[in-house]
Structures are given as C-alpha cells and as structure tokens.
C-alpha cells in the first residue's frame, strides 16, 4: 500500500511493484494496472493523496519512459483522489484505470458515468463488469445497473486512447 502509515508496509508495496514491473517487462507488457490502496475510514483523503504523490514520484524513477502504471479505483467514493494523485505526479507514465463496477458499489458516492470526465485526461484503461449498485459482483455486462453503452461511448469520446478489459 503506497500510502501506508507503516514504512515497512510501504517498502513491501514498493518491492512488490518492482517485481510486477520486472515481470511485465520480461513479458513485453507495457501497461500494468495497480491498486492505489485507499481504505475509507482509515486514510484521510488529503493525506492519502499527499503520500501517494510522494510514493509514485519516487517509484516512477524506475519505470521506463514507454511504460504506463494505471491506478485503479477500488474503494474510492469519487474520482477526486485518483485524479489528484495523477495531477500531482504529473508524469505520463502514471495513468488511471476506471473500474466501472467498483464505481457502482456501495462505497462510491459518484455514479459510474460521472467518473469519466474528471479521469479522462489520465484514463488509460477501463475494467467493464456490472452489478446492482451494492456489491462487487463482476456480473455480465448486461446484468446490472451500470449503463454500459453510455459508459463505453463516453470513454471512447473523452479518452480515446483508453483500452478495455471485460472482467
């Protein structure tokens, strides 16, 4: 967890991210999706952003110029923290991954469609799966309350370089 309070946990996260980067490079992969580690009611959003910006600025020194790390929303209530991290780091090697199913769970206070515009300048990848607005069910695209057609259309229009994965 890049924003962990315990420095040993941050060091472990950095070690695991290095291992992931090395494995990806060995396989010829140029983009990896990572979880940023936000946990509601544990981290103050401002502190999480501040610590994450410091962590990623430091870690990106080890990342090749043609490689992208995309931070995925998992438990964030809105896109604000991830967008603030990407803007604060201000490096094309750090992008964002929108998981539309996660944006449609009980932890999100922002409808999935409303995540796209703020994330668009940094959006590099999108995870597509559906649910009924509470739990992270990873249901088929047509079984849930996420407006998939609108989501895909908005991403293609606002972040045309983003890639997609059906989860």
Residue ranges of predicted features:
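Conserved radical SAM core fold
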Residues: 1, 39-41, 130-136
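Conserved, mostly hydrophobic/aromatic
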Residues: 13, 24, 32, 69, ...
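Acidic/histidine-rich catalytic cores of soluble enzymes
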Residues: 53-145
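Conserved residues at the C-terminal ends of beta-strands
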Residues: 35, 129, 167
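Short amphipathic alpha-helices and their capping/turn segments at secondary-structure boundaries
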Residues: 16-27, 83-86, 111-121, 152-157
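Glycine-rich S-adenosyl-L-methionine
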Residues: 144-153
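Active-site acidic/histidine proton-transfer and metal-coordination neighborhood
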Residues: 2-95
């Amino acid at each position: 967890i890049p924003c962990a309070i315990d420095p040993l946990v941050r060091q472990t996260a950095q070690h695991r991210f290095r291992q992931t980067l090395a494995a990806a490079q060995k396989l010829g992969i140029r983009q990896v999706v990572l979880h940023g580690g936000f946990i509601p009611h544990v981290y103050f959003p401002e502190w999480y952003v501040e610590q994450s910006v410091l962590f990623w600025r430091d870690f990106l020194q080890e990342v090749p110029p043609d490689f992208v790390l995309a931070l995925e929303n998992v438990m964030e209530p809105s896109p604000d923290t991830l967008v603030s991290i990407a803007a604060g780091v201000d490096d094309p090697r750090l992008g964002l991954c929108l998981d539309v199913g996660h944006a449609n769970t009980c932890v999100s206070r922002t409808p999935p469609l409303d995540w796209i515009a703020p994330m668009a300048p940094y959006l590099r990848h999108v995870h597509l799966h559906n649910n009924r607005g509470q739990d992270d069910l990873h249901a088929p695209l047509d079984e849930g309350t996420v407006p998939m057609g609108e989501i895909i259309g908005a991403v293609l229009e606002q972040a045309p370089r983003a890639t997609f994965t059906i989860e």
